Each structure stands twice: as C-alpha cells, then as structure tokens.
Swiss-Prot record:
CDD domains in alphabetical order: S14_ClpP_2
General function of this protein: Cleaves peptides in various proteins in a process that requires ATP hydrolysis. Has a chymotrypsin-like activity. Plays a major role in the degradation of misfolded proteins.
Name of the protein in question: ATP-dependent Clp protease proteolytic subunit
GO molecular function, one term: ATPase binding
Subunit and partners: Fourteen ClpP subunits assemble into 2 heptameric rings which stack back to back to give a disk-like structure with a central cavity, resembling the structure of eukaryotic proteasomes.
Main location group: cytoplasm
Active site: 125, 150
GO cellular component: cytoplasm; endopeptidase Clp complex
Amino acid sequence: MDDFRKYATKHLGMNAMVLDDVIKSQAGYLNPYILEERQLNVTQLDVFSRLMMDRIIFLGTQIDDYTANTLQAQLLYLDSVDPGKDISIYINSPGGSVYAGLGIYDTMQFISSDVATICTGMAASMASVLLVAGAKGKRSALPHSRVMIHQPMGGAQGQASDIEITAREIQKLKKELYTIIADHSGTSFDKVWADSDRDYWMTAQEAKEYGMIDEVLIKK
C-alpha cells in the first residue's frame, strides 16, 4: 500500500486527502494495475484490460446482465478489430442468469472468431453451457477444475395462470439448454436430461469423457 501511495502522489497527481477517499471507496480492494513501457511511453492498465489486448477474456463472477453486456461487448470488439483470430475465455463462475448467459452464448456463435474456453476453477450451471459452447477442439480445463450441469431454477407467485406461464417458460429453457449441451458435447439429449435432474458434478477428466471439454491442461 505504501508503494501505491507513493506512486499515486508522485505520478498521478493525487494529494493525500483524495487518495484516502479513493482507497476508502474501494472498500479494501484495489483492482490490479500494471505499468507497461512502450517506446519511452508508460501506459497504466488494469491487468484484465492488458490481457484483453492479447484476446484473453475472464469470466470470473456470477453471470448477470452487467457481466453479460461487458463480455458480449468484448467479444464483438475483438472480432471487429481482427476477424477470424481466436479469442480465449477463461471461466471460473458458479453460473447465474440463464437469459444473460444465452446472450453470451449467441454472441459466441455469431462472431467469426473461434472462441476457446478454459475452465480454471469451476464452470457450473450456465457457466458450464458457455464452457461446452467453445469452438470444437479448443475447450479445456485445468486438472482440478469442476464442471456442473443441472436443470434451470426459477420461482413464481401470484395467480395460478401466471405460475403456469412461468412454469412453461422454465420447461422451454430446460429443453433449450439441454439441446445446446447435447449438440456441443455429443452426449445424447436423453442422457443430459437424466443427468441434469439434480446437480451433476464432473472432474476435468470426467468432463472430457462427457464431451464438455476436449483437453485437460497439464504442464509438460
């Protein structure tokens, strides 16, 4: 923290009072930054933005509308600046909103660049759908990663007709998600349906055998 304080006051022109306000507003967390020197020019970037310059995107949170919008924008931008060049998404997520996740999925399928997916910790629920949706032959996981599939969850209240409408929508989503997993994994729809009735956990090797990934990454 002392080094950061010295850097901020010397190079960013922040006085001690402003710096204290910034630190307090971050509630103890500072987004990681790096300094990159290019032809005598120094550029300050957060580490995730620097990695995106190498076409690497991180999905390391629960999937919600904000996360989905950001990730879709990153995919569209990288595809526009260099169409057809691979993009990598590193996934460590418990899942989240199905609708937000389907927006990411459709964008992955829409762009011309192949999207490689790598599970670095956990790809559960909707995140597992994004993992399996990577380009064939370019889906992988680290050895101790976990992959989990299950049926979509939801709830409803109000009039009986409203509950019926919500229940029908959940059933549609269920079939849609299972079809995506079956199509990309090569596992039969009936097996995906049966396995997803409850939380179905897989190790990296089991996920490979299931068709969720193509390779378990092991350092050679």
